[in-house]
Amino acid sequence: MAEPNPTRSGDAASLFVSGAATDARRGALSDAFDLANEPAYRLWREAKLTAFPSDNAGLVVTLRDLARPTPAERQAILERCGVANLAIYDCQAGATDERQLRRDLLAFAESLNLVRLEGHRSAGEDGIVALEVADEGSRRGYIPYSDKPLSWHTDGYYNGPGARVRAFILHCARPAERGGENAILDPEIAYIRLRDEDPNLIAALMHPSAMTIPPNTEADGRIRPASVGPVFFIDPATRQLQMRYTARKRNVIWRDDDETRAAARFLLDILTGGEPLIFKVRLAPGQGLICNNVLHCRSAFENGEIETNGRLIYRMRFLDRVGGAQSGRLTEPDPAEAEWPN
């Protein structure tokens, strides 16, 4: 499934560290995304592809207790997110009671410094969204709450800059009878493919008006304003590369120039053309994804005849990055992050 050399190489691989990186390392990483700094990019690129896992097994962390991961388990998750922006966890001893499971998920997230939950309209009082087929109510008609395929995207691509989603957790309570597979790609791998093809493609996607999501009227009558911003940007709070993207053809407006159109086409080709570093996973009960808002999609699924046994995935979106140092469970946008970086 994946092509990199699984052996890490000295100085290059040392750019990838678990937990909170030092300011110097953060600076080295942000320098790598400067189109004028080719040496820094080449060093980072070598480290990334050398350290990148070759298959799903390299992403998996087994947990004994979802609510209380051990220091070693926590470290293993941070290491995988440090290298691939993603970890797959497996906890077969978790709670079966829905309320307890939701409490355990919050505790698990907090153990990894994920505390600032997005204030999503479909979330419960605890900030967790139940992704399941909804035939009525405010969720009806939205693709995530159907059994239809969900195209490639990053979470919260329609949010404004003050509510940018930096991380999310998907936890499987019940799988579908058939289908419901996720495909996942680290945005940094997409960045590498684009920049290696032509740095001008990256420049186009870093333009502050590269992608516009038009205004939308929510089911409760509230109007979500237009979101205009880049596809790739350096997050000023973390100095890490972040991405906002959707492969949808409706309700998305690309900047009207040849470079942006070419970049959008090439990016879609990466996602649909057999990229070897795309991971595919069909979560089983007790398994989940924890990531720094990676690109992902979902195949169509069938629940079978018993609706109460249908696919149920709990989703938590965070304004924090995995392993970040924020504190306090906030749901309001940060006024200091009210604009997209230029």
Regions found by a protein language model. Name each.
Residues 4-69, 80-82, 126-283, 288-289, ...:
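Active-site environment of non-heme Fe oxygenases that use a 2-His-1-carboxylate facial triad
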Residues 70-76:
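Short amphipathic beta-strand starts and helix->beta connectors
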Residues 82, 86-127:
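Long, mid-chain structured domain cores
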